[in-house]
């Protein structure tokens, strides 16, 4: 197409299996989109607010500058809250249009969001996310060296994916769904709650509270 309206991307794919974007991919894609007249939206619903550890926003890790940023989830720490930030140029385009949100600007939600931002800063949760993430990655890679069923350990901060396969040395096909489900359920007996994701549903998603 000669023109593109919008390029939307997660800096780290969340439900897709905690996959960091390949080095340079987003940057080059954004260049092409901009050249075709499009905008760049960074989806920070999962990566925002310090969860990557090394940076407050996922797009900062990539060295990109989005036109629009979507955010939610940890923004309210359990309280239903989401927001969209945008450049002045994009906002000016919306100004003449009729846009509204029935619950937009809810004062209780705004108070919750403000306190979350304060706690993230006051309790240094971004640094904690980095430290605990490094600890997780070290331990998980030690487990990977012992068990051939762990195909990959990846992520940053408290956004970590553990991909389960049949045998890392012989068969990288996804672990049998029944076996994966059995492990997934048994972890609950140890007080551990994982998410799961990936194209084949064979990735443990480790995204605990940043505190």
Give the residues covered by each predicted segment.
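Conserved N-terminal phosphate-binding loop of PLP-dependent enzymes in the Aspartate aminotransferase
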Residues: 1-211
């Amino acid at each position: 197409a000669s023109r593109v309206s919008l390029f939307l991307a997660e800096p780290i794919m969340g439900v897709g299996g905690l996959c960091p974007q390949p080095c340079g991919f987003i940057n080059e894609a954004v260049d092409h989109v901009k050249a075709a007249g499009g905008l760049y939206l960074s989806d920070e619903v999962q990566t925002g607010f310090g969860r990557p550890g090394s940076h407050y926003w996922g797009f900062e890790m990539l060295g990109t500058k989005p036109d629009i940023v979507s955010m939610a989830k940890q923004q309210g720490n359990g309280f239903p809250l989401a927001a969209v930030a945008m450049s002045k140029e994009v906002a000016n385009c919306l100004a003449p249009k009729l846009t509204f949100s029935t619950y937009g600007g809810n004062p209780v939600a705004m108070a919750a969001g403000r306190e979350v931002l304060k706690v993230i800063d006051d309790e240094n949760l971004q640094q904690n996310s980095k430290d605990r993430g490094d600890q997780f990655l070290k331990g998980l890679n030690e487990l990977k060296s012992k068990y051939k069923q762990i195909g990959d350990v990846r992520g940053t901060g408290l956004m970590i994916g553990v991909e389960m396969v049949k045998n890392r040395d012989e068969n990288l096909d996804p672990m049998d769904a029944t076996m994966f489900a059995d492990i997934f359920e048994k972890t609950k007996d140890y007080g551990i709650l994982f998410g799961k994701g990936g194209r084949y549903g064979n990735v443990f998603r480790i995204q605990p509270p940043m505190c």
